[in-house]
């Protein structure tokens, strides 16, 4: 599995840029604020339609543009893939793999897997639970399509429930729908908790082994 090339149009500070990667190791160098991290972000976004940095899609669209397009040429599972994602202000994003439209981000699972590490990852330890959930969401969405589907549905229900509570003062009858929303959110939440617990268990085993090797067996790392 490898990313052979990437083309960006109006993504972050890239008006139009195409980059071809070597099949082995690639080192990206440049001055500050030249777009090195933006390029890595684009690669991650092509893998799972989730950004490790942006909280909203419009943050990734250039200030002077209405839409952004990302295209990745990927070799995976013995064949070539072209992954395309289009982001638009005020419109739903469009995704496709080999020109076949994707209905949800989980449809990208398994085409390109990425591992993103940056200095901000120290927030996993120093910051609150939100940073750790974001890390797990980004990782699990690439590995388990069912997790990504449950996460998308949970967020949709959460947003809808928030609107109900906001408008209930003027329309009290909206509150009648809350029990159904609570049940469906609990069902999606159970799926998320199940996968997160399994992920933490596997990560704890690998992390303990790696730390044991780094410390010469003098220290034992545990995750909880």
Task: Enumerate the predicted regions with their spans.
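Pre-Walker A-like glycine/lysine-rich segment at the N-terminus of P-loop NTPase domains
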Residues: 1-45
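An accessory alpha-helical subdomain
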Residues: 120-217
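Short hydrophobic/aromatic segments of transmembrane alpha-helices and their interfaces
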Residues: 2, 42-43, 113-116, 182-183
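Conserved P-loop NTPase catalytic core
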Residues: 223-224
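Regular, well-ordered alpha-helical segments
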Residues: 45-48, 163
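Phosphate-binding site recognition
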Residues: 15-16, 20-21, 44, 53-61, ...
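Nucleotide-state sensing region of NTPase/ATPase domains
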Residues: 48-131, 137-147, 204-209
């Amino acid at each position: 599995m490898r990313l052979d090339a990437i083309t960006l149009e109006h993504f972050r500070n890239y008006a139009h840029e195409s980059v071809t990667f070597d099949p082995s190791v690639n080192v990206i160098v440049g001055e500050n604020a030249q777009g090195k991290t933006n390029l890595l972000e684009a690669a991650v976004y092509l893998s799972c339609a989730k950004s490790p940095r942006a909280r909203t899609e419009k943050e990734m669209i250039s200030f002077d543009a209405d839409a952004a397009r990302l295209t990745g040429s990927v070799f995976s599972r013995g064949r070539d893939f072209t992954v395309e994602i289009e982001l638009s202000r005020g419109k739903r994003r469009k995704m496709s793999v080999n020109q076949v439209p994707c209905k949800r981000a989980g449809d990208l699972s398994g085409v390109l897997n990425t591992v993103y590490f940056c200095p901000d990852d120290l927030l996993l330890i120093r910051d609150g639970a939100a940073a750790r959930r974001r890390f797990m969401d980004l990782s699990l969405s690439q590995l388990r399509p069912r997790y990504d589907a449950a996460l998308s549905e949970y967020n949709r229900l959460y947003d809808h429930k928030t609107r109900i509570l906001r408008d209930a003062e003027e329309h009290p009858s909206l509150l009648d729908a809350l029990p159904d929303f609570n049940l469906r959110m609990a069902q999606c939440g159970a799926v998320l908790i199940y996968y997160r617990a399994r992920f933490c268990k596997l990560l704890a085993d690998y992390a303990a082994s790696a730390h044991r090797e780094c410390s010469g067996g003098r220290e034992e790392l545990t995750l909880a």
